[in-house]
From Swiss-Prot:
Glycans are attached at residues 23, 31, 285. Receptor for ADP. Coupled to G(i)-proteins. May play a role in hematopoiesis and the immune system. It comes from Homo sapiens. Residues 71-77, 139-161, 233-252, 322-333 are cytoplasmic. The keyword Protein biosynthesis does not apply. One of its GO terms (molecular function) is G protein-coupled purinergic nucleotide receptor activity. GO terms for biological process: G protein-coupled receptor signaling pathway. The keyword Cytoplasm does not apply. Stimulation by ADP in stably transfected CHO cells resulted in inhibition of adenylyl cyclase and the phosphorylation of the MAP kinases MAPK3 and MAPK1 in a pertussis toxin-sensitive way. Inhibition of adenylyl cyclase and phosphorylation of the MAP kinases are transduction mechanisms that involve G(i) proteins. This is P2Y purinoceptor 13.
Length: 354
């Protein structure tokens, strides 16, 4: 009887011991990371200048896009996805000044704490909203080809609105704990690394969210490749069947089909290759200091590429959305040319224009 009671007590203590061991491992890795000083010269001098250019360009392009989309009704799934993409890009753009001032050390150290707890979290949240929306845009173009005449539920505006709301709420709720769990006291020393503001639970949640976001990216990436292989085949077959001799226009229209994949791959793929080893280095006590700094620079470089997405998405609006192009002030005088190109190949237009 005594042995049974002793066994029961040992089992009840086991989960607590396991949790403490897990937390100890995480904190050991974090403490080693904290002792490794970062070489911030590039981050402090070069990237703020580059981000400033991206911010000014992005605010100009997205403000213009906002003005145009205000005058376009949300009458199709394609337009709804584009409008949500624009909102995500605008929010990302508005988060950049905080990063610029913080990284350049032009603002007090308290701003860095704000960046770690709020603006950086919002930036990443809206970035992944944009990634999923680019996947939905590719899916919408895919459906337009395989079901061009069928009025299925997936092509109705109510579906696009519902799935867009779900995406925003899902990413908001998994991102919110990253703000709440950055609850350690901020000091001039601790804000140099955002991980310093997190406890063991915060670091584990950060890892989990990173894994979820990696899963989101690679799922969207693979599906997008599948969609555009089908689209490429359709475009090729369309050109073969049409006996048009205007090869120049054919090449332009073919290029438009792949603008989503190009933007997606150039902006987001490098960051996701660099993100996994960087996050691992922050909680692994075996990563040496030099490698940590190299991974940090790689992460910051690829993060800059991801931020350029706010300037690249307007290319999607221009190349793929006919209604957007027609509303642009600089395109008003080109309606006649656009109409002649529209009549050139109706099937290709159905693929590329929304």
């Amino acid at each position: 009887m005594t042995a049974a009671i002793r066994r029961q007590r040992e089992l009840s203590i086991l989960p607590k011991v396991t949790l403490e061991a897990m937390n100890t491992t995480v904190m050991q890795g974090f403490n080693r990371s904290e002792r490794c000083p970062r070489d911030t010269r590039i981050v402090q001098l070069v990237f703020p200048a580059l981000y400033t250019v991206v911010f000014l360009t992005g605010i100009l392009l997205n403000t213009l896009a906002l003005w145009v989309f205000v005058h376009i009704p949300s009458s199709s799934t394609f337009i709804i996805y584009l409008k949500n993409t624009l909102v995500a890009d605008l929010i990302m753009t508005l988060m950049l000044p905080f990063k610029i001032l913080s990284d350049s050390h032009l603002a007090p150290w308290q701003l860095r704490a704000f960046v770690c707890r709020f603006s950086s979290v919002i930036f990443y949240e809206t970035m992944y909203v944009g990634i999923v929306l680019l996947g939905l845009i590719a899916f919408d173009r895919f459906l337009k080809i395989i079901r061009p005449l069928r009025n299925i539920f997936l092509k109705k505006p109510v579906f696009a609105k519902t799935v867009s709301i779900f995406i925003w709420f899902f990413l908001f709720f998994i991102s919110l704990p990253n703000t709440i769990l950055s609850n350690k006291e901020a000091t001039p020393s601790s804000v140099k690394k955002c991980a310093s503001l997190k406890g063991p639970l915060g670091l584990k949640w950060h890892q989990m969210v990173n894994n979820i976001c990696q899963f989101i990216f690679w799922t969207v990436f693979i599906l997008m490749l599948v969609f555009y292989v089908v689209i490429a085949k359709k475009v090729y077959d369309s050109y073969r069947k049409s006996k048009s001799k205007d090869r120049k226009n054919n090449k332009k229209l073919e290029g438009k089909v792949f603008v989503v994949v190009a933007v997606f791959f150039v902006c987001f793929a490098p960051f996701h290759f660099a993100r996994v080893p960087y996050t691992h280095s922050q909680t692994n006590n075996k990563t040496d200091c030099r490698l940590q700094n190299q991974l940090f620079i790689a992460k910051e470089t690829t993060l800059f590429l991801a931020a350029t997405n706010i300037c690249m998405d307007p290319l999607i609006y221009i190349f793929l959305c006919k209604k957007f192009t027609e509303k642009l002030p600089c395109m008003q005088g080109r309606k006649t040319t656009a109409s002649s190109q529209e009549n050139h190949s109706s099937q290709t237009d159905n693929i590329t224009l929304g």
